[in-house]
């Protein structure tokens, strides 16, 4: 299964970020806790050289808690500051401001030596489409100050948000990178909704997810749909279609509808807490 999505506006957005990076002290990078490595744009490391770095494991309430901790340890070992958050319900948000101060302590000390007081920390908020940047900013700022959407590609243009916490945030559009060298990355991103569904083969993607869940979260499909997980992935999708009454005319099974139900249940956490890539040991 080949997955690629890099619309033209992302090239423009990347160029703008290259200019804006000169203005900031800290990069706050949101990643999807269900796919922490796959949801990191490799271009950010190049853009963010010599900048303090904070990774937010967002949507952590949807991800396997053991893997949340494993990924936190992994990124900390790479030199990042890391906080587990869920920007929708505010979980983990209280810790962020203290971590920002810690990440920028050298900048704060530099300002102090120069006699500069209370200059706000300027942070750029980055992440791939649909990772939850706008929701994070709204929750962190405590007011509706950035556009919100549940589809990739909603936030456009440049937005600075001044916070009372002595921090200025620069929101940026969600951008991917031109080519996924590893197709598994594209597939994982498609599963969590960071690539538009309407350019994907959702039935083929559903078969991938079924195979992954049977291997790594055995029994979770059986419990959710009251079906057997035995047989091929196609047979399991058929069982889900029957269990949820996904039928066309003449009693033909509606695989497309069953696939959408599967992804709605996965993405919303109705199946339970699931991580699609595990931290390296």
Regions found by a protein language model. Give the residues of each.
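Alpha-helical scaffold segments in soluble metabolic enzymes
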Residues: 95, 99, 135, 208, ...
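Canonical P-loop GTPase G-domain recognition
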Residues: 61-126, 145
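Short, solvent-exposed amphipathic alpha-helical segments in soluble enzyme
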Residues: 44-46, 72, 141
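Short, structured loop/turn "capping" segments at alpha-beta junctions
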Residues: 107-111, 144-150, 216-220
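Glycine-rich phosphate-binding P-loop
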Residues: 122-142, 147, 172
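Helix-rich effector regions associated with P-loop NTPase G domains
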Residues: 1-27, 33-43, 47-53, 60, ...
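Conserved active-site beta-strand-loop modules that form the wall/rim of enzyme catalytic pockets
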Residues: 87, 137, 167-170
